[in-house]
Amino acid sequence: MNRSKYIDNIQLSENNNKLHAHIVGWYTGGKIDDHQFYVVVDGREAESHFERVDRFDIASQNNMSSGKRIGFNLVSDIDGYEAIETLQLRVRNAGKDELLLEMNKRNIKNIVAQTAIEYNIDEAILINSEGKEARLKV
């Protein structure tokens, strides 16, 4: 494999005109410890948070020493979903800036429409035929 970057998964969801972006992938260019992944929306940097992730599979395929933290997991919450025209994922590395992903409004809306909604349920209330309640903590 001779690729230096790849996006494994993009999840976009919208709630109350806020876009929630979760992007997972890997990048092997430049000095690994200097990677700063970030999101740009309509030409302006948006608040985002990322963490580095070990990707032993990719390190092995690229003949890199094992344990390199070349994977990334990025999350960003962006206000004004309806007005967003473009979204970019970029990386700063050793003084250089590189585009990893770019989506236009149509791409964003298509991914939002296809992203499954996840719910975390912490309690269920069961009511039997006699009207008695039973609470179940999950």
Q: Can you annotate each of these PLM segments?
A:
Residues 1-138:
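Basic, ligand-binding patches in group-transfer machinery
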